[in-house]
Curated annotation (Swiss-Prot):
Region (Required for binding calmodulin): 782-810
UniProt-listed CDD domains: CBD_MYO6-like, MYO6_MIU_linker, MYSc_Myo6, MyUb_Myo6
Residue span of region Interaction with OPTN: 1107-1109
Residue stretches making up the Myosin N-terminal SH3-like domain: 2-53
GO cellular component: a single term: actin cytoskeleton
Chain positions covered by the region annotation Disordered: 934-957, 1117-1151
Name of the protein in question: Unconventional myosin-VI
Residues where Phosphothreonine is found: T405, T1088, T1091
Region (Responsible for slow ATPase activity): 273-317
Residues covered by region (Actin-binding): 665-672
Membrane topology (UniProt): Peripheral membrane protein
GO terms, biological process: actin filament organization; actin filament-based movement; DNA damage response, signal transduction by p53 class mediator; endocytosis; inner ear auditory receptor cell differentiation; inner ear morphogenesis; intracellular protein transport; regulation of secretion
């Protein structure tokens, strides 16, 4: 199969594995893995892809691959990753795989210099190349740019963002202090906003959009950082293997002893906000020695330090202090920041217990007194006020007027704990806002022409337990994925269609319904959550119930017990919900959703913190007193500031900014869950590539044009350098001349209606044209002028030649018209007078023989006069007949009657002469005359026989034409009947198509949900029982990895495919048949066709055999080599007819299966695709011959003028023959296509077909057909 070429087939853990096709099934292919000879498994046919011939080859741009599909994309990334080439392009999109180690000199200053001003694709893929492209686009297009760095947590987004910022400031900075400040801002932001998670040691727990602003000279003048959604819940609690924000650990590990004493710091295990997570520091061998023992937690002392090449808490503290100094923070302000951070830690150590009184409140535990004192001192609060504010809440009554009585309500232990945590979150979030503001103050700018923005925001997150933070992060990623879909897929395809480029449409999953579910007005999850917050007694359970109630049948929303993970099935319906995101289904536990959505403190704590004695603490809260209060909130109720809608507003503003700028994309990929170098988990990576839209982009870029410029834009760029004669040119003509002058290959670009477009990998050529320095433009103008002169001279030459050719053509046509006219006239005259001419010739021949009669008579001795008289009478009769034929319009029958009478007379006369002739000499002469007459008679009979044969052939042809006309009339009647029915079923078909589209979307979503569940399960969760049966390749909770068998994987793939419409139709038809052949192998079908005597089984096998051939050829056509010509096993007119007129599957000809099937023969013109446009005069036109034995083709021939005939017979050459049945080809409806058997057999024999078929029969390769049976009878 497939000429022994390898293919990629699905693999549960590696994504794909290489194998060979060994059999074609109903809707699957049987694959033999290359590394497991003798073992086979089945794979859905749409999940199998052809592989590159050289499996070790890698390319820098995936669009350069010979086969563009997700398997070769994954393999190319894998090969490059094994060579430490972590960057790869898909057109102008960069794929970055996290290496988890520092590649030497890869991001050095020398590397930066190397990429400056270089076009995309001229150097190996690099994040620097994308940064430089964004800069050049900004400079040339006079438009701000955005670089969207996306990917899941741990994929390397933060590091790539830092590299982009560093590249822009080093390459295009002014060389002043501001360049360093932009770069040094990152360590400070990371210290306060990054933390260790399960999947990432340096995970950004906030989103940021960093703008680098440029002046009119395109030099860096300043920057601005916008931040989004800091994860505040992490301040109070973390997972077992996770940590709080880096700043806490760096302060504990690296702070000098004097600062440590001032802040009352100790080891991380001493603080509630740190000791419930991981309390180990990141450290190297050197820094581990520098950390004092009393700063290390027991866990650290037992297990040692955490290792990461980019993190070192002790060393990073010093680097953070240096960064603070560089961005302008003095020692006092630095100490203020540390003081608030320490205050938050001590605040977390305040504990409560039930009060002994009847008030039902609580009091501080005795052992919490030191923590209370430290916290109050560090935050500038009164100790007693802090105690009271944490254990009571102030309420105002409205008795009879606006002013009311202040009432202090005691808080229970749980409420006091919540109040303490809320205060800690608020203080830290305000501190983080202050840090970002100070960062922005350190690189101000007065004027800005354009900016380049770099977006680094938390990637799609999915854990065993997901809360409000993951909900907001994933909502953000849904919006960004939609932006990617619109910018790269939707807008790109709309532009191609508008410009008339004829690029094939690429389908992608639209996630607008998921976004509407979250943000729709009144019924969206965010608005429902806000309404819940405004209730007097809000609850998470009520909120969850309302969400399920308002979106009961929504495809994207589901209840937890439908999760594919067992841990989620224990969650009650009012405790969570599942949202099916673009990357897969995530189960959110709604506990604390209501609390986390409210960013406001209760009145007691708000008043306390705003009246702090510490100036720095007061400043943190001055700008946030009532700015964010909910305008719908009524007086007297608890204050409410919606976190969700605030984030939604920020996100919409961000997307408006992204839509107004040019876009570049960096898709970051994490290679494995263990966060180790040189370990490639193909299944994980494939899922990330599919979710990020890379596979759809690859499909689009097969015929896409990622670079473009408008004609007017190019023309205006060159206009001031153009001489007057060139300035008059139309912009489109000027662009054409420009490209020709540069010698660009026409296949590398394409002209639209208003723009010119460039193929992927041709960015260097595009940049050469768009380069705007005066010397370069002037040089190109010279080239254009030279090309125009040459092209116009060539045009004059071609015009002269064309006029001469036209003159010759007119003369030729005139002579051809005369030739046609005289030929037609000749034919008409011939048809009219041919019988008479033939009759005259025959009669004249008879008259010539009278001389011989006279010679005989002259030799007679007696009866000469009487005999002469008889001869004269005969001669008179002949002359009379000739005159009659000449002067009278007679039919052939009349002429033959006259002629036969004369022949009889002459024969009677001859008989009489024979009686009279006695001598031998005379008898011999008479004998000779008789022989001549006998020859004449035989000649006449042969001629008559030939004439009748010609008449018979004409009759057969007329019968064939009459039959074709009858079939055409019947077809027209059927079509009229179908049109009558079509109106009734059209709506039904439209509904079915819509349902199928939705069903395919559901299948795709289920696949992503299952993959996401598998990825979560690999971190330690357990799949549900049903999913475990499907996904045997998962790591279960006990850590044992089970490999999915080939049969299990095939079953899963087949189940996914079996719901498709074509397969359902086939299976429904198969169910109605007597024989179920769905599980038969391809070879079994072929052998049965060759050997079976069961007519019904034979017909069923033939039908299934050719159906599988059609499926296989469709797969080959879809997965052909890039830019390769489509294989043609039949003329294009035949295949086009089959595509445009799909025939319904009929029920076995109503079981009428005849042994002697009808034999039909056809001939139609055939021109090879490669010669279609090279040969306008059809000099290379060939002929395609086909012999159909019943509905299926038995023999096939291709005759071309410049190559040897191609002979094919059924059985031996099935893969190269037309796989369509006779009805599907439409040949019976083509006028003049059907020929006589004799015409086919003559050509077949002349081309050596008999010997070819005989060899196939002898080698047992030919399938038994009418042709093989006739040849075998002939040989016998």
């Amino acid at each position: 199969m497939e000429d022994g070429k390898p293919v990629w087939a699905p693999h549960p853990t590696d994504g794909f594995q290489m194998g060979m096709i060994v059999d074609i099934g109903t809707d699957y292919l049987t694959i033999e893995p290359l590394n497991q000879k003798g073992k086979t498994f089945q794979a859905a046919i749409n999940q199998v892809f052809p592989a590159e011939e050289d499996s070790k080859k890698d390319v820098e741009d995936n669009c350069s691959l010979m086969y563009l599909n997700e398997a070769t994309l994954l393999h190319n990334i894998k090969v490059r990753y094994s060579k430490d080439r972590i960057y790869t392009y898909v057109a102008n999109i960069l794929i970055a795989v996290n290496p988890y180690f520092d590649i030497p000199k890869f991001y050095s200053s020398d590397a930066i210099k190397k990429y400056q001003g270089r076009s995309l694709g001229t150097l190996p893929p690099h994040v620097f190349a994308i940064a430089d492209k964004a800069y050049r686009d900004m400079k040339v297009l006079k438009m701000s740019q955005s670089i969207i760095v996306s990917g899941e947590s741990g994929a390397g987004k933060t590091e790539n963002t830092k590299f982009v910022l560093r590249y822009l400031t080093e390459s295009y900075g002014t060389g002043q202090d501001i360049d360093d400040r932009i770069v040094e801002a990152n360590p400070l932001l990371e210290a306060f906003g990054n933390a260790k998670t399960i999947r990432n040691n340096n995970s950004s727990r906030f989103g940021k959009f960093v703008e680098i602003h440029f002046n009119e000279k395109n030099s860096v003048v300043g920057g601005f950082v916008s931040h989004y959604l800091l994860e505040k819940s992490r301040i109070c609690v973390q997972g077992k293997e996770e940590r709080n924000y880096h700043i806490f650990y760096r302060l504990c590990a690296g702070a000098p002893e004097d600062i440590r004493e001032k802040l009352y710091l100790s080891s991380p295990d001493s603080f509630r906000y740190l000791n419930r997570g991981c309390t180990r520091y990141f450290a190297t061998k050197e820094t581990d020695k520098q950390i004092l023992q009393n700063r290390k937690s027991p866990e650290y002392l037992k297990a040692g330090s955490l290792k990461d090449p980019l993190l070192d808490d002790h060393g990073d503290f010093n680097r953070m202090c240096t960064a603070m100094k560089k961005i302008g923070l003095d020692d006092a302000e630095k100490l203020d920041l540390f003081r608030v951070v320490a205050g938050v830690l001590h605040l977390g150590n305040i504990d409560f217990e039930e009060a002994g009184s009847t008030s039902g409140g609580c009091t501080l535990k005795a052992q919490s007194q030191p923590a209370l004192e430290c916290c109050a001192a560090l935050l500038g609060l009164d100790e007693e006020d802090l105690r009271v504010s944490l254990t009571t809440r102030v309420m105002l009554t409205t008795a009879g007027g606006a002013k009311g009585t202040v009432i202090k309500v005691p808080l229970k232990v749980e409420q006091a704990n919540n109040a303490r945590d809320a205060l800690a979150k608020t203080v830290y979030s305000h501190l983080f806002d202050h840090v970002v503001n100070r960062v922005n103050q350190c690189f101000p700018f007065e004027t800005s022409s354009f900016f380049i923005g770099v977006l680094d925001i938390a990637g799609f997150e999915y854990f065993e337990h997901n809360s409000f933070e993951q909900f907001c992060i994933n909502y953000c990623n849904e919006k960004l994925q939609q932006f990617f879909n619109e910018r790269i897929l939707k807008e790109e395809q709309e532009l191609y269609q508008k410009e008339g480029l004829g690029v094939n449409e690429v389908r992608y999953v639209d996630n607008q319904d998921c976004i509407d579910l979250i943000e729709a007005k009144l019924i969206g999850v965010l608005d429902i959550l806000d309404e819940e917050n405004r209730l007097p007694q809000p609850s998470d359970q009520h909120f969850t119930s309302v969400v399920h109630q308002k979106h009961k049948d929504h495809f994207r929303l589901s209840i937890p017990r439908k999760s594919k993970l067992a841990v989620h099935r224990n969650v009650r319906d009012d405790e969570g919900f599942i949202i099916r995101h673009f990357a897969g289904a995530v189960c959110y536990e709604t506990t604390q959703f209501v609390e986390k959505n409210n960013d406001a403190l209760h009145m007691s704590l708000e008043s306390l913190i705003c009246e702090s004695k510490d100036k720095f603490v007061r400043q943190l809260f001055e700008s946030n007193t009532n700015n964010n209060k909910d305008p719908k909130q009524k007086a007297g109720k608890l204050s409410f500031i919606s976190v969700g809608n605030k984030f939604k507003t920020q996100l919409n503003l961000l997307l408006e900014k992204l839509h107004s700028t040019g876009s570049s994309f960096i898709r970051c990929i994490f290679p494995n869950l263990k966060m180790t170098s040189h370990h490639f988990e193909g299944g994980q990576i494939l899922s990330q590539l599919q979710c990020s839209g890379m596979v759809s982009v690859l499909d689009l870029m097969q015929g896409g044009f990622p670079s473009r410029a408008s004609f007017h834009e190019l023309y205006n760029m060159y206009k001031k350098y153009l001489p007057e004669k060139l300035a008059r040119l139309d912009p489109r003509l000027f662009c054409k001349a420009l490209f020709k002058a540069l010698g660009l290959n026409e296949i590398d670009y394409k002209f639209g209606l208003t723009k010119v477009f460039f193929r992927p990998g041709k960015f260097a050529e595009f940049d050469q044209i768009m380069k705007s320095d005066p010397d370069h433009l002037a040089e190109l103008v010279k080239r254009v002028n030279h090309w125009l002169i040459c092209s116009r001279w060539k045009k004059v030459q071609w015009c002269s030649l064309s006029v001469i050719k036209l003159k010759n053509k007119i003369k030729y046509r005139a002579s051809a018209c005369i030739k046609i006219q005289k030929t037609i006239r000749m034919w008409l005259c011939k048809r009219k007078h041919k019988p008479r001419i033939d009759g005259l010739i025959k009669v004249r021949t008879l008259k010539k023989r009278l001389d011989k009669f006279n010679e005989v008579v002259s030799a007679l001795k007696e009866g000469k006069a009487e005999t002469s008289k008889q001869i004269k009478e005969l001669e008179y009769s002949i002359d009379a007949s000739m005159t009659k034929i000449k002067t009278t319009m007679m039919t052939r029958e009349q002429i033959m009657k006259e002629y036969d009478a004369l022949v009889r007379s002459s024969e009677q006369l001859l008989s009489a002469l024979q009686k009279k002739k006695q001598q031998e000499e005379e008898a011999e002469r008479l004998r000779r005359i008789q022989e001549e007459m006998e020859k004449e008679r035989k000649r006449r009979e042969e001629e008559e026989k030939r004439r009748r044969k010609e008449e018979e052939e004409r009759r057969l042809k007329s019968e064939i034409e009459a039959k074709r006309k009858q079939e055409e009339e019947e077809r027209k009647k059927r079509e009229e009947e179908e049109k009558r029915i079509q109106a009734e079923i059209e709506a039904q078909l439209a509904r079915e198509r819509e349902e199928e589209t939705q069903h395919q979307a559901i299948l795709e979503q289920e696949r992503r949900d299952r993959e996401l569940a598998m990825r979560i399960a690999q971190t330690g969760a357990e799949l549900s029982t049903e999913e475990t049966k499907l996904d045997v390749g998962l790591c279960r909770a006990n850590g044992t990895k089970l490999q999915m068998t080939a049969e299990q994987m095939a079953k899963e793939m087949s189940e996914m495919l079996s719901r498709g419409p074509a397969v359902q139709a086939t299976k429904a038809a198969a169910g109605a048949k007597k024989h179920d052949l769905s599980k038969w192998k391809y070879a079994e079908l072929r052998d049965t066709i060759n050997t079976s005597c069961d007519i019904e089984l034979l017909a069923a096998c033939r039908e299934e055999f050719h159906r599988r051939l059609k499926v296989y050829h469709a797969w080959k056509s879809k997965n052909k080599k890039r830019n390769a010509e489509t294989e043609q096993r039949a003329p294009k007119s035949v295949t086009d007819y089959a595509q445009q007129n799909p025939t319904a599957q009929l029920p076995m000809r109503q079981q009428e299966i005849e042994i002697n099937r009808q034999q039909r023969y056809f001939r139609i013109p055939f021109i090879r695709p490669m010669d279609q446009y090279k040969d306008p005069q059809n000099k290379k036109k060939g002929w395609w011959y086909a012999h159909f034995d019943g509905p299926w083709i038995a023999r096939q021939m291709e005759l071309h003028p410049d190559k040897a005939p191609i002979l094919l017979v059924a059985g031996k050459d099935d893969m190269d023959m037309c796989e369509l049945n006779l009805e599907e080809t439409g040949l019976t409806r083509k006028r003049g296509a059907e020929i006589l058997p004799r015409q086919f057999e003559e050509i077949w024999e002349r081309c050596g077909g008999i010997q070819y078929l005989q060899n196939a029969i002898e080698s047992r390769q030919a399938r038994p057909t009418y042709a093989t049976a006739m040849l075998q009878n002939l040989l016998k």
